[in-house]
Regions:
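C-terminal and inter-domain tail/linker signature
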Residues: 1-100
Length: 100
């Protein structure tokens, strides 16, 4: 499984409340930015598992991948609504784990 595939699978499982793979691929010092707000590992897990049912996530398209960086793109929608959006995600790795 590629890094992009693993991230996609882990995210989709986390959105259903299964955090095992997400825990496995995240670096202990993971941190991201979302709308200029810093999100740490535990916050990210909580956001995904609690808000997952609110979204329908489309298939992922890998834009770029190497050992240290992955860039993916996907379309999603708010569940049961005609509200669609697209997201481009940049993922960096440290020691084989997602760090940002």
């Amino acid at each position: 499984m590629t890094k992009a595939e693993a991230f996609d699978k882990a995210t989709k499982l986390a959105m259903k409340g299964d955090l095992a793979l997400y825990d496995e691929i995240l670096h202990p010092d993971y941190e991201s930015m979302n709308q200029r707000v810093r999100i740490n590992r535990e916050m990210s897990k909580s956001i995904l598992s609690e808000n997952g049912p609110l979204f329908t996530v489309g298939p992922v398209q890998k834009i770029y991948e190497n050992e240290e960086f992955v860039c993916i793109h996907r379309f999603s929608r708010i569940a049961n609504k005609d509200v669609f959006y697209e997201v481009q995600t940049a993922i960096t790795y440290e020691n084989g784990k997602v760090i940002t």
